[in-house]
Each structure stands twice: as structure tokens, then as C-alpha cells.
Amino acid sequence: MPKPRTSTGEKNLISKRIIKLREKHNMSQRLLAYQLQLNGYDMDKNVITRIETNKRYVTDVELKALSEIFHVSYDYLIDGKEDEI
């Protein structure tokens, strides 16, 4: 059974917002991965790259981790409709 995708065929809903947040915070993919690792999440630069290029699905744990790092809600990451916290 195929995994679900967005209406445009993407594997995740958050790639554009992750790029936007990372750039807003002047973070490279490597620095974001490092910050995630410091917070106990096993994500490396390659994971960030694959998420940002829609080549990888995002788990609930990863969504939580990214929400914590950027201090935004899950709703913002998924829908982009809610203001950042």
C-alpha cells in the first residue's frame, strides 16, 4: 500500500516552513542537526536535507523536535496558519 502524499505529490507538509525558519534563525542544516542532537534527537544533516527536499516523511517525534527547536506550534509547522509562538 502506498504511503500518503500531499496533493502535489510531496512526502511532507513542513519542508518550506523548515527552510524559512532555519533561514530566519541563520542556521545551516548542519547547525540545525547539531541543535537537535544536543536536545537528544538523533537527526543528522542528511535527515534535514531529505526533509527539506521532500524526499523523506516526517515522524511525529521529528515534528515535536523541530517545534521545540524553533519555538513554534505543531499547527504552524503543518498548516502554516497559526502565528509562531
Predicted segment positions?
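A short, Lys/Arg-rich alpha-helix, primarily the initiator
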Residues: 1-25
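Short, charged recognition helix plus adjacent turn
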Residues: 2-9, 68, 75-85
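Flexible coil/turn residues that form the inter-helical turn or adjacent wing/linker of helix-turn-helix
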Residues: 14, 25, 41, 56-59
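Residues that mark the N-terminal boundary/hinge immediately upstream of a DNA-recognition element
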Residues: 17, 28, 59-62, 73
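Residue-level detection of the helix-turn-helix DNA-binding "recognition helix"
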Residues: 19, 23, 37-38, 53, ...
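Short alpha-helical DNA-recognition segment
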Residues: 26-50
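Hydrophobic micro-packing sites on short alpha-helices
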Residues: 32, 62-70, 77-78
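Short, basic-rich loop-to-helix N-cap that marks the start of a DNA-contacting helix
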Residues: 46, 53-68, 84
